[in-house]
Every structure is written in structure tokens, then in C-alpha cells.
Amino acid sequence: VPLAGVLNGLGYVMIARIDPELAGLQMMWTVLGVGLFTGVLAVLRNSRNLSTYRWTIGLFGLVLIALPFTPLGTTVGGARIWVSFGPVTFQPGEFAKVALAVFFAAYLVEKRELLAMGSWGVGRLRIPDPKHLGPVLVAWGVSLLVMMYQTDLGSSLLFFALFVVMLWIATARASYLAVGGTLFAAGAVFAWSTFDHVQRRVRVWLDPWEDVTGEGYQIAQSTFAIADGGMVGTGLGQSGQVAIPVAETDFIFAVIAQELGLFGATAVLVAFLLLVGTGLRTAVRADNPFDTLLATGLSALVGVQAFIIVAGVTRVLPLTGITLPFVSYGGSSLLGSWLLVALLVRISDGNNRRAAQRDGQPVVAGRADA
């Protein structure tokens, strides 16, 4: 929780510096996010209760992903990932990823032995019976297809990584990583050869200077900003002449690197590593498979999402357009991130309580590692 608060606070400071008009809205979303965090802890007394409603939660996640295809859907920045209810616009995919993590965790606990052993195969390669793997593949496939047609490849990659990591942890079979990598490579080639927006992003990634005043302008300005920051940065509010469009969302890490330098950017990355590490420690200490898988999946969501956006800003990967958890501007992202942390805290607190009861020790209310 302290790490999430630090990242959220840093994000607010940077947003207030970039666009003071957005600072008030970000503060409102922060208050609502903390309220959601508190509400989840108050209502959800045992994280394992979520597994009882796995099919409902999984279906809810898919409905959230499909919502932008309805008349309520709105296209912003070329991606149809938003839903509008009057003056309120939100991104349902931020909540769908948490719902699918719950579904995957519950389903993999039930079927992990069958998935690990495999029922048929060729030679030494054992493949699970499709009827056991089918529901997970359907949820994964529908998520990826919908996200690709919404031109939101960042979320597609995030859902894919969530699926592969949780399947690997559930079965302890490294072959799933190999299969996942193969599927990713095939999907990347297919997306590049099929979708114009993917081809444009790859071209901009490989050579932003080819159209530096057009499609390559954002990433070029981001590169200049990071270089301008040097080791110690230009100082808060001293970003000079380098202006990055939409810096408060996709490119906020570039602004951090510019104003706080390499040291500040590294500190942010360390904070994310500590947050993910705390989540994984919660997973390791869990006393039941569902909590272990769910904590692993939630931790993977934070780590992979942070990696994707930082890698996009620094041109390690093509830019995907997702947000930096807790730091970027946006109500949906902030609420989804606080919901995720609330589940991690509930898992940690529940396991600590049960461990204390087994040891005959008094239970301390609210004690948690995450």
C-alpha cells in the first residue's frame, strides 16, 4: 500500500505540473480509488469466496471487454476502448483484466492437474485434453480478438502475458512458456500483416525520424526529453522546450526521466519492482492454490503493464498506448490499480490471520504484507 501511494502521489505531482486543470480530476480519482480500496476490504472478507463465482466473474470480464463495441463505445486516439454514459467516460478493460485474473486463477486450480499431466500427445510432448483447456483458451482468444479489433494491442499483450504466466505457475510446465512464445510470435506476424495500425506503429518504432513531424513526433519528442534529463534531471517544472503530446498518459515516464533524470526514473522502476515483489511474496506465502495463483496473476499484471509502457517510451518495444499503473492520468486506470492492490492486501491479510490462528497467536486486525 505505501508503494502504491508513493507512485500515485508522484503521478499526481507530475500531472499537476503538466496540466494543472487535470490535477483536480486526478485528485478526485485518487480519492475514489482509495475509497474503492477500502470498500473492497470491507466487503470481501475472504478472497477465496471469489472462486465460487468464477464463471460469473469471467463472463463479466468478457462483457466489459465487449462493451466498447456497443453503441456506448467511443473512439479516442484511434482506439475504441472507451464507454460513455452521459458525461462519464471510462475504460472497461482496466476492470476486465482483474476479473479475468480471478477467473483464470479459479479455473486453473480446478483443472491444473489435468493440464499439467496432459492426456494425449506426440512422443514426449503431452497436450491437455481440449475440453479441459477449452474454457481458458476461449476466454483468452476472445479477449485478444476483441482487443485487436479495438486497435488496443497493449491490452492484448497484457492479457496474453497474464494467461501464459498463470498457466505456467499452475502447471509448473515450462513447455507452456515455449508454446506461449510461439503463439505470441505467430500472433505478432499475423497482426503486422493484417492491421494497418500495427504496421504504422512498427514503422514508427523502427524509425521515428522518417516522419518526425507526423506519426513519429511523439516518440521523437520522448527520446529528446529523456536525453535532456541526463542523470539528475532538469528539475520539476523545468522541462525546457521539449513538449510531448499527451504526456500525462502514454508518455508520463518520459516526463519523469526528463525532470528527475536517470536517478528518478530508476527510483520509479525500483518502486514497481518492489510492488511486484511484494505481490509475489504474498503468492509464495499463501496457504491455498487459489490465493497463490490470483496473487501471482495480479502481480504479473502490474509488472507486465509497467514494462510494456516503459519499454514503449524508451523504444525497446513498439508503443502500445497503455497507461503506467498509479502514475498516468486516468480514472479507469487508477480505480483498476487500487482494486488490484485491494485484492492483494486481502489475500495477504487472510493468510496472515489463518497462520496466526494455527499458531494460537492473537489476530491483529488489518495486518497485511502487501
Question: What does each of the following model-derived ranges do?
Answer:
Residues 1-218, 254-312, 339-343, 358-370:
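Hydrophobic alpha-helical transmembrane segments of multi-pass inner membrane proteins, especially
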Residues 51-55, 95, 225, 231-232, ...:
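Long, low-complexity hydrophobic alpha-helices enriched in A/L/V/I and glycine
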Residues 86-96, 150-151, 230, 234, ...:
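Glycine/serine-rich anion-binding loops at beta->alpha junctions
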Residues 152-157, 232-236, 247-249, 262, ...:
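Transmembrane helix boundary and interhelical junction motifs in multipass membrane proteins
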Residues 208-252, 262-264:
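TM-adjacent membrane-interface loops and short helices in multi-pass inner/ER membrane proteins
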Residues 317-355:
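Transmembrane alpha-helices of multi-pass inner-membrane enzymes
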